[in-house]
């Protein structure tokens, strides 16, 4: 069970990181490397902090993932990563600042991902 906790921790961190990165980047104007100077960073500090926090979330997620792999067989652990696809979709359509639309097809896709994860991690019924 310890491995699943680490795996879920990794999924939650990577999901939050992705949503934070999206917010930071969608609120940062288009730029080139030449545009980045102290004034630009100061003017867009919340966005840069969000991007840095998102990258840190990815790093922490990877650390959790290392521990998940230590305790879980790969054929059980790896499908857990797919949870983040469904969770990011739910976050993107639920949080008003993203203004992303939910469609039946996308929602069904997220549902199938969840169903697949459940099927892979369900123990087979023992035959007597």
Curated annotation (Swiss-Prot):
Pathway assignment: Bacterial outer membrane biogenesis; lipopolysaccharide biosynthesis
UniProt-annotated location(s): Cell inner membrane
GO biological process, one term: lipopolysaccharide biosynthetic process
Keywords: Cell inner membrane, Cell membrane, Lipid A biosynthesis, Lipid biosynthesis, Lipid metabolism, Lipopolysaccharide biosynthesis, Membrane, Transmembrane, Transmembrane helix, Transport
CC annotations in GO: plasma membrane
Membrane topology: Multi-pass membrane protein
Classification via InterPro entries: Flippase_ArnF (IPR022832), Small_drug/metabolite_transptr (IPR000390)
Any one GO molecular function term: carbohydrate derivative transmembrane transporter activity
Segments passing through the bilayer: 6-26, 48-68, 78-98, 102-122
Keyword check for Transmembrane: yes
Segments in the Cytoplasmic topological domain: 1-5, 69-77, 123-128
Periplasmic-side segments: 27-47, 99-101
Subunit structure of this chain's protein: Heterodimer of ArnE and ArnF.
NCBIfam families referenced in this protein's UniProt entry, alphabetically: PRK02971.1-2
Role summary: Translocates 4-amino-4-deoxy-L-arabinose-phosphoundecaprenol (alpha-L-Ara4N-phosphoundecaprenol) from the cytoplasmic to the periplasmic side of the inner membrane.
Entry-linked PANTHER family: 4-AMINO-4-DEOXY-L-ARABINOSE-PHOSPHOUNDECAPRENOL FLIPPASE SUBUNIT ARNF-RELATED, SMR FAMILY PROTON-DEPENDENT DRUG EFFLUX TRANSPORTER SUGE
Sequence similarity: Belongs to the ArnF family.
Protein name, entry field: Probable 4-amino-4-deoxy-L-arabinose-phosphoundecaprenol flippase subunit ArnF
Organism field: Yersinia enterocolitica serotype O:8 / biotype 1B (strain NCTC 13174 / 8081)
Gene this chain is encoded by: arnF
């Amino acid at each position: 069970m310890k491995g699943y906790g680490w795996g879920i921790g990794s999924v939650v961190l990577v999901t939050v990181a992705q949503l934070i990165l999206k917010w930071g980047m969608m609120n940062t104007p288009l730029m080139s490397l030449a545009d980045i100077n102290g004034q630009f960073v100061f003017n867009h500090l919340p966005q840069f902090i969000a991007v840095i926090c998102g990258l840190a979330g990815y790093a922490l997620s990877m650390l959790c993932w290392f521990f998940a792999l230590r305790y879980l067989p790969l054929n059980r652990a790896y499908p857990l990563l797919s949870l983040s696809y469904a969770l990011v979709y739910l976050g993107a359509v639920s949080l008003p600042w993203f203004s992303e639309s939910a469609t039946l097809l996308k929602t069904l896709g997220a549902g199938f991902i969840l169903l697949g994860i459940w099927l892979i991690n369900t123990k087979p019924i023992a035959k007597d």
